[in-house]
Design a protein with these regions (language model features):
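ATP/adenylate-binding site constellation spanning eukaryotic-like Ser/Thr protein kinases
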Residues: 7, 35, 66
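A short, hydrophobic beta-strand/beta-hairpin element that forms part of a small beta-sheet core
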Residues: 52-60
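Thiol/disulfide oxidoreductase modules built on the thioredoxin-like
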Residues: 41-50
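Thiol-based oxidoreductase modules, predominantly thioredoxin-like and allied folds used
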Residues: 27-38
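Short hydrophobic/aromatic patches at helix-to-coil boundaries
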Residues: 1-3, 71-75
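Local sequence-structure signature of Cys/Sec-based thiol-disulfide redox active-site neighborhoods
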Residues: 1-23
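Short alpha-helical
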Residues: 11, 37, 68
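Conserved N-terminal glycine/acidic-rich loop preference
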Residues: 60-66, 70-72
Length: 75
């Protein structure tokens, strides 16, 4: 399962979500700007407040680290 913790105004979040869509991956988009519980979950998982944070089956990737994301997805 893939979760993307993001905000509507984050350009890297948009880039990340477009990348996942282009590669054919479905994901849960979690807007942490209006969901305090999700924001706390994101900080607990990643140790940081910044977005995007990607959770790929429990592997946490902070930011749009394209090579690390591709590796985690088996691309």
């Amino acid at each position: 399962m893939i979760k993307v913790y993001s905000t509507p105004t984050c350009p890297y979040c948009v880039t990340l979500k477009n990348f996942l869509k282009e590669k054919g991956f479905e994901f849960e988009d979690i807007d942490v700007s209006n969901n305090q519980q999700a924001a706390e979950e994101m900080v607990q998982k990643s140790g940081q407040m910044g977005v995007p944070v990607l959770d790929i089956d429990g592997e946490i990737i902070a930011g749009f680290d394209k090579e690390r994301i591709k590796q985690a997805l088996g691309l």
